[in-house]
Amino acid sequence: MASPEYQRFLQSVNIGYVEWHDGIGYDLEALKSLCPTERQQAEDLLLSRRSDFRDIEALDTLGTARALDGIEGLLSSRNLELRLHATRRLAARKRISSDKVESILLDTLPNVTPGKGLTEALSLAEAHPTEAVRRRLLYCAVKGNDDLRVHAAALAHFLYGGSTASFDWTHRPLYLRLGSRVRAERQAAYEELC
């Protein structure tokens, strides 16, 4: 029979609307307290899923070589949010190089949208602001998708020292001009940004 901790963990894996909406993770305290047999069962379950940031978070909590290899397998996922969450976790553990983080950011930044990696990409770019990443943010500020341009401009402005926060509200009017659908307006705002 499953322990109360394992039952709690399994219940937390079945997320509903509130957990999804609020980004509530699995019960990691219950996961940490499992006996070795149940930890293995939990790891098997998580490796079979790997479809949500919560799975990555729980695999990272387990921290076994097999769990971390499972996270590493997501570095080539078509799901940008999963790829970026995996990148963050593996970079924190020094399992991937700074060059690999940069490569993933350069590949994913132009394609992220809300709910599909935007927040994670910007957070990771802020934590790994190489020159190539900053240049890619500038590119996205002008040529990125409608949802990305404003945020890419704000973060680039900050990373190049032009503002005091990753989204400096005192510069919001400038950032919003980069959100225009009219390319000439974006170009004029870009020149002001730089």
Model-derived regions: residue spans:
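Extended repeat-based scaffolds of very large eukaryotic assembly and lipid-transport proteins
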Residues: 1-66, 73-84, 93-99, 106-111, ...
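Extended alpha-helical scaffolding segments
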Residues: 117-194
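Hydrophobic core positions within HEAT/HEAT-like alpha-solenoid repeats
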Residues: 56, 72, 86-88, 119-122, ...
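Alpha-helix capping at helix-to-loop junctions
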Residues: 92-96, 127-130
